[in-house]
From Swiss-Prot:
The gene is fbp. Mg(2+) 1 binds at residues 101, 120, 122. This is Fructose-1,6-bisphosphatase class 1. NCBIfam families: PRK09293.1-3, PRK09293.1-4. Binds 2 magnesium ions per subunit. The lineage of its organism: Bacteria, Pseudomonadati, Pseudomonadota, Betaproteobacteria, Burkholderiales. Its cofactor is Mg(2+). Belongs to the FBPase class 1 family. Pathway: Carbohydrate biosynthesis; gluconeogenesis. It is found in: Cytoplasm. One of its GO terms (molecular function) is fructose 1,6-bisphosphate 1-phosphatase activity.
Amino acid sequence: MKTGEIPLSSSTYINFKQYLASVKPAGAALPTGLQDLLIAVVNTCSKLSHEVAQGALIGLLGPAGTGNVQGEVQQKLDIIANDLLIDGVQGCKSLAGLASEEMELPVPVQGTGDYLLLFDPLDGSSNIDVNVSIGTIFSVLKKQDPAAPLQTSDFLLSGRHQVAAGYVVYGPQTTMALTLGDGVVMFTLNKVTGEFLLIKDSVTISHSTKEFAINMSNMRHWADPVRRYVEECLAGVSGARDKDFNMRWIASMVADVHRVLSRGGVFMYPWDQREPHKPGKLRLMYEVNPMSFLVEQAGGVSTNGTDLIMDLQPTDLHERVSVMLGSKEEIDRIQHYHS
């Protein structure tokens, strides 16, 4: 049995509620309000897993005929996932407000707490119709002034302010990765009971790797440091790296990052010259910050090439950034090429 894996006997599994009640990420019990919020999010993801699995059988595939705040075509499941998550957490007394990739403005919640929830309800939704793994990404912040009315600026905190982050990937299994700032753990959904059960209690990313993920069709548009790194990987043993690499690309960030957390590697979605005024494609608050929190807590690194993602100060709720994350030795090399 590999280190960090839980024995397969059903009597030894720990469910999500039991885990939250027992963990002490800062030497003290996890606040009840944070437990309640995370349980509400995860219970909703359990329901969403069922909806995703039914797909065409209940008429949920295909475009919805609407667009989101980003100007992107919404899939039917995008809207359903967004509505499910909002409904699922509205009753949390510890929640002050939420923000979604699918909505222009944050939504106040009639709770008395000081937690803020940000989420991408269904990452990779362009892959729904071809049955590729998709997922939900979430991040939790603390409101700096609990007594003040909710404002968009309350959410504009760097990734270092996250108190929890995770994703749920809907694939052959429904699996969740979670960090509370003290390492990364993984759970798998028991679809009979609806419970998420702990399967790995210490997820780590190897410092070295021979695997990278990037959309190679855009190579001609990349900046020189990224092109140099990828060209060296492609050269393999005959080039400067003196080892062969494999390339992977799913076009679903949640699936690509899940692979990095599971077996190491590098995921890259860099700036390109087609839209030079935009620093990147992926959303800092809903996708990149929570994934970077997970990657750092697993021993990896996440950067935009020059700065660590977690240190970036956001200026817009829907801000986009470039990102390169994963195994430390490779990301350090990419950062060096940018210097």
